[in-house]
């Protein structure tokens, strides 16, 4: 039988999702826990690999097994052997035709950014950080140039193994969580607040969102006009873009599947995310 799992994790301690020789990865920890619960080797396939330091709110994986277990037994049993920063949220039997990666029609990511004169402490490792005020209107204008199907070579890491740099971005939303009423403007007019950037696309290149974030922040700080984003995109050269932004605030929200698979979506447990 084939089983799908929804998995969440804090990526700070891991060298990304994908299993690597002599490396501490989320996939290695998950498969080790599944193996201990199932008392047999288990191999998983995920919906989307994440880089070192990147978090997962609802990674979806599937695996094949001969064991017959109730869905919640897979949840409880696997979590027993997982470290505290990884958790299986749900388990569900799926048809053999289901494939966590191939059946996903889209993928969603969020980047959470703290704007503050002082670096994050409690949120360290869970949010990105800027100490300059960002121009919301300029950032909104800039990301419009990225919507649709494009060659995203300028935002692709040199180590990217994707066959094609052409991807489609369906949506980029930018929201700001305002500070409490009456709060001071802080240093140099930098009002402490959280920014949330949400991306939805058919697929993403290695470091693509972090490279886009570097450009968005540069434009938000007034270093470049919004039109610079199109210039970078059309250059089709990594050298044209801003430096890769920190992985700390990047979250894989999860894949999007057709209703025919009947899989759970993002859980209310993460409504706290700024």
Curated annotation (Swiss-Prot):
Any Gene Ontology biological process: tRNA pseudouridine synthesis
An annotated Gene Ontology molecular function: RNA binding
Pfam families named in the record: PseudoU_synth_1 (PF01416)
Record-linked Gene3D superfamilies: Pseudouridine synthase I, catalytic domain, C-terminal subdomain (3.30.70.660), Pseudouridine synthase I, catalytic domain, N-terminal subdomain (3.30.70.580)
Enzymatic reactions: uridine(38/39/40) in tRNA = pseudouridine(38/39/40) in tRNA
Keywords carried by this UniProt record: Isomerase, tRNA processing
Active site per database record: 51
Residues involved in substrate binding: 109
InterPro entries, A to Z: PsdUridine_synth_cat_dom_sf, PsdUridine_synth_TruA, PsdUridine_synth_TruA_a/b_dom, PsdUridine_synth_TruA_C, TruA/RsuA/RluB/E/F_N
Top EC category: isomerase
Enzyme Commission number(s) of this protein: 5.4.99.12
Subunit and interaction comment: Homodimer.
HAMAP family listed in its UniProt record: TruA
Known role: Formation of pseudouridine at positions 38, 39 and 40 in the anticodon stem and loop of transfer RNAs.
Record-stated family: Belongs to the tRNA pseudouridine synthase TruA family.
Name of protein: tRNA pseudouridine synthase A
Source organism per UniProt: Acidovorax sp. (strain JS42)
């Amino acid at each position: 039988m084939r089983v799908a799992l929804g998995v969440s994790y804090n990526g700070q301690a891991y060298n990304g999702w994908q299993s690597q020789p002599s490396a501490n990865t989320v996939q290695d920890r998950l498969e080790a826990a599944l193996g201990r619960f199932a008392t047999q080797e288990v191999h998983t396939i995920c919906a989307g690999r994440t880089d070192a330091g990147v978090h997962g709110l609802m990674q979806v994986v599937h695996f094949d097994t001969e064991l017959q277990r109730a869905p919640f037994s897979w949840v409880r049993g696997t979590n027993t052997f997982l470290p505290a920063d990884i958790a299986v949220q749900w388990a569900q039997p799926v048809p053999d035709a289901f494939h966590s990666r191939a059946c996903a029609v889209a993928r969603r990511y969020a980047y959470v950014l703290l704007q503050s004169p002082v670096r994050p402490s409690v949120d360290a490792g869970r949010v990105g950080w800027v100490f300059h005020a960002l121009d919301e209107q300029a950032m909104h204008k800039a990301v419009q140039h990225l919507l649709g199907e494009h060659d995203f070579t300028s935002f692709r890491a040199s180590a990217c193994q994707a066959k094609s740099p052409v991807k489609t971005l369906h949506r980029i939303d930018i929201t700001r969580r305002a500070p409490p009423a009456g709060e001071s403007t802080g240093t140099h007019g930098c009002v402490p607040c959280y920014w949330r950037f949400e991306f939805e696309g058919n697929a993403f290149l290695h470091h693509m969102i972090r490279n886009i974030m570097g450009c968005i922040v540069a434009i938000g700080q007034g270093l470049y006009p919004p039109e610079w984003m199109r210039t970078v995109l059309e250059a089709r050269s990594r050298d044209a873009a801003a430096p890769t932004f920190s992985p700390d605030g990047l979250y894989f929200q999860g894949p999007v599947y057709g209703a025919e698979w009947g899989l759970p979506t993002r859980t209310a447990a993460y409504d706290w995310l700024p």
